[in-house]
């Protein structure tokens, strides 16, 4: 893949959220509010230091692309949802979410127009660019996920709500793009369950006008509480807490790939990134589907080869074996590898070890490809 004019074989990166430095999580003013960001020099300095620490972990592991780590929250729900509620003008009070895996989280409530209340990812992007000279990636929670996780008392339809959220997110994305980040990632972790009829339109609206960065659509089963995601069965009632003990059986008929390919190809994206080796993805997430629905021209495929729902660190050989299997389906010049999802639910030292394994396993396969090319 061509990154900053350099051809990188099987580029490596982590998907997203990462264990924060503990001192940053204890920062009393970390969750500032209002339209001025950050409100003072002390918090600005702390933010930059936290992003630099997370960037340094990635650089030491040898990742090709450095991510922001979603430093704006100290837990998965805060990073993926509640932070956005505050930035988009939600009331943080609301009923339960209607998705089985997230059903014990509360939806934010909308009582008026969606708009940005201060920048969303601009300050993180600035700090990341300052922290590293390597290619950078900034990520956002997807429009479908945010739209579905809303107790709406204002808009007449979910489509109206989605397009309003997309417009607000797009304002921020354009500012981040203008800073010169290399990749902008949109996390659509409810796509494997179903696509709303406006899903692709809203995704494309959110990234409209991006001129510099490559667009990544990250799709996974979700990672709340470390649980494997699942399809609901008839015991699940929308809007209620879903009692796992009453679930009749694990859904096994669908895979992440089978759920989103080829529909996801309609989105304006440069990279499709899927969870591929986790507990719901024992068969590499059903990637055989891509043989019948090949990648569109100029779209790369990045696959998760690190299981973030296990504390066991993969060996380099295990990672290499997963990459070799991927190469049976996706050519090396269009393949990248990542973690399955964010690493925040792990201890930081385990997250560091997993990033090292990701890089070392990729090095093994790169060497094999180089040797085969020389012999040809």
Curated annotation (Swiss-Prot):
Its EC number is 4.4.1.23. It comes from Xanthobacter autotrophicus (strain ATCC BAA-1158 / Py2). It catalyses: (R)-2-hydroxypropyl-coenzyme M = (R)-1,2-epoxypropane + coenzyme M; (S)-2-hydroxypropyl-coenzyme M = (S)-1,2-epoxypropane + coenzyme M. Binds 1 zinc ion per subunit. Zinc plays a key role in activating an organic thiol substrate for nucleophilic attack on an alkyl-donating substrate. Its cofactor is Zn(2+). Inhibited by methylepoxypropane. Inhibited by the zinc chelator 4-(2-pyridylazo)resorcinol (PAR), in the presence of p- (hydroxymercuri)benzenesulfonic acid (PMPS), and by EDTA. Not inhibited by the coenzyme M analog 2-bromoethanesulfonate (BES). Belongs to the vitamin-B12 independent methionine synthase family. The keyword ATP-binding does not apply. Keywords: Lyase, Metal-binding, Plasmid, Zinc. It comes from the Bacteria. Gene3D superfamilies: 3.20.20.210. This is 2-hydroxypropyl-CoM lyase. Zn(2+) binds at residues 218, 220, 341. Pathway: Alkene metabolism; propylene degradation. Changing residue 220 to A: Retains 0.06% of wild-type specific activity. Decreased binding affinity for CoM. InterPro entries: Met_Synth_C/arc (IPR002629), UROD/MetE-like_sf (IPR038071). Involved in aliphatic epoxide carboxylation. Catalyzes the addition of coenzyme M (CoM) to either R- or S-epoxypropane to form the thioether conjugate 2-hydroxypropyl-CoM. Catalyzes the reaction of CoM with R-epoxypropane at a rate approximately twice of that with S-epoxypropane. The CoM analogs 2-mercaptopropionate, 2-mercaptoethanol and cysteine substitute poorly for CoM as the thiol substrate. GO terms for biological process: methionine biosynthetic process; propylene catabolic process. Optimum pH is 8.0-8.5. One of its GO terms (molecular function) is 2-hydroxypropyl-CoM lyase activity. The lineage of its organism: Bacteria, Pseudomonadati, Pseudomonadota, Alphaproteobacteria, Hyphomicrobiales. It is an enzyme of class 4 (lyase). Disulfide bonds: none annotated. Homohexamer. Component I of the aliphatic epoxide carboxylation complex together with components II, III and IV.
């Amino acid at each position: 893949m061509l990154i900053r004019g350099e051809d990188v074989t099987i580029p490596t990166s982590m998907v997203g959220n990462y264990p924060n430095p503990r001192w940053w999580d204890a920062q009393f003013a970390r969750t500032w509010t209002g339209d001025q960001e950050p409100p003072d020099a002390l918090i600005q300095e702390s933010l930059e230091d936290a992003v630099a620490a997370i960037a340094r972990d990635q650089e030491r592991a040898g990742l090709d692309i450095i991510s922001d780590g979603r430093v704006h929250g100290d837990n998965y729900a805060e990073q993926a949802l509640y932070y956005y509620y505050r930035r988009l003008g939600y009331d943080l009070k609301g009923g339960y979410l209607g998705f089985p895996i997230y059903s014990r989280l509360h939806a934010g409530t909308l009582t008026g127009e969606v708009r940005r209340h201060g920048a969303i990812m601009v300050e993180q992007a600035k700090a990341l660019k300052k922290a590293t000279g390597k290619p950078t990636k900034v990520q956002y929670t997807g429009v479908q996920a945010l739209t579905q996780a809303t107790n709406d008392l204002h808009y007449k339809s979910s489509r109206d709500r989605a397009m309003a959220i997309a417009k607000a997110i797009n304002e921020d994305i354009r500012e981040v793009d203008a800073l010169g980040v290399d990749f902008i990632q949109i996390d659509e972790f409810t796509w494997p369950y179903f696509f709303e009829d406006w899903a692709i339109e809203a995704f494309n609206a959110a990234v409209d006008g991006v001129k510099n960065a490559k667009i990544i659509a990250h799709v996974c089963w979700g990672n709340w509480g470390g649980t494997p995601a699942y399809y609901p069965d008839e015991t699940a009632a929308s809007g209620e807490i879903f009692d796992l003990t009453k679930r009749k059986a694990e859904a096994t008929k669908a895979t992440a790939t089978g759920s989103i390919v080829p529909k996801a190809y309609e989105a304006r994206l440069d990279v499709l990134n899927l969870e591929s080796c986790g507990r719901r993805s024992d068969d590499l997430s059903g990637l055989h589907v891509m043989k019948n629905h090949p990648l569109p021209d100029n779209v790369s495929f990045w696959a998760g080869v690190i299981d973030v729902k296990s504390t066991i660190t993969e060996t380099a050989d295990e990672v290499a074996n997963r990459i070799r299997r991927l190469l049976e389906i996706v050519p090396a010049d269009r393949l990248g590898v990542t973690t399955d999802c964010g690493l925040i639910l792990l201890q930081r030292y385990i997250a560091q070890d997993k990033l090292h394994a990701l890089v070392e396993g990729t090095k093994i396969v790169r060497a094999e490809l180089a040797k085969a090319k020389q012999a040809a």
